[in-house]
Amino acid sequence: MSSSISPLLTTAISVAILLFSTISTAATIPNIHRPFNKIYAFGDSFTDTGNSRSGEGPAGFGHLSSPPYGMTFFRRPTNRYSDGRLTIDFVAESMNLPFLPPYLSLKTTNANGTATDTHGVNFAVSGSTVIKHAFFVKNNLSLDMTPQSIETELAWFEKYLETLGTNQKVSLFKDSLFWIGEIGVNDYAYTLGSTVSSDTIRELSISTFTRFLETLLNKGVKYMLVQGHPATGCLTLAMSLAAEDDRDSLGCVQSANNQSYTHNLALQSKLKQLRIKYPSATIVYADYWNAYRAVIKHPSKYGITEKFKACCGIGEPYNFQVFQTCGTDAATVCKDPNQYINWDGVHLTEAMYKVMADMFLDGTFTRPRFSDLLIKKLNYL
């Protein structure tokens, strides 16, 4: 499996080990010089490659096991909330690794009772939250929501670790990239219209998420990328539900974007503290908010012609209705998903996920640059 990676990414690898030459912008990392042998992913529906099925994901988006999901690349539904690949898929491809198997479909053990050799596992779950499910139950907010949280994903990871032999565990932390996809947007979404304030959600979410990251770091994780929240005010769902006078300079929902921006500031502050506390680890922040807005500002630069409408859905003005979402009988699909940012009202098209992957991998919207993480890793080889 091959895919293009950015010239900057290729250059970083070349400098680090002095074994690469720039062949073209479509270069791939040779198997013998993979910077990472494994990737472990966490997150929500923006990263989930199959831990959810139809009827199990976010309320109103329960048709991911049916066409037209998966139409662009896989030609069939693969339980990804998109027409094709996600950002994590492009990350795996860029490192010449297979797509990550979802944890719930993984055959974890062999005849000896130890874990089968894989190139990583995806623990992300669609609709998941950062805050424990019990919090939402206590506040009568658990109707039609996914019960899994980041702590569920951590528990799955720890259960997976139990199947590993000693050498496998050592190799896992030495040779693995931990990709923490966007998670926490659902915490805000599930409390909309309730008496629970966004400040409360932010404080609980950031503190819980920080504990999650520290648990991984205490286990020995050395290479970690953490995505911030995207510009949620630019999503079709937000555009269709918010008041028309609630708009920012880009035409997105200002209140929603401000909420994501404030959350990301708090997250970045915590990451700075973690870098000081764990100096031997490399923790990269992926600025999803600004990366997304960069595409909104200059869509034609990325081959995009439709910034706000959903490719798959029904109804004006955004081709989206909450009760007739993608996969229902009434929904239709646009002719070319590659020209759209949004796939089904909330989730993105393969084309947009690829743009995000490229921006993160080439370091345009990562701090420190993703290439710095690669150089540090390859200097240990």
Swiss-Prot record:
UniProt keyword annotation of Mitochondrion present: no
Localization per Swiss-Prot or TrEMBL: Secreted
Active site: S45, D344, H347
Pfam families to which the protein is assigned, alphabetical: Lipase_GDSL (PF00657)
GO biological process: fatty acid metabolic process; lipid catabolic process
Keyword Hydrolase: yes
InterPro entries: GDSL, SGNH_hydro_sf, SGNH_plant_lipase-like
Highest taxon listed in the record's lineage: Eukaryota
EC number of this enzyme: 3.1.1.-
Gene Ontology MF terms in the entry: acetylesterase activity
Glycan-carrying positions: N112, N140, N258
Signal peptide segment: 1-26
Main location: secreted
CDD domains the UniProt entry points to: SGNH_plant_lipase_like (cd01837)
Family indicated by similarity: Belongs to the 'GDSL' lipolytic enzyme family.
Protein name: GDSL esterase/lipase At3g48460
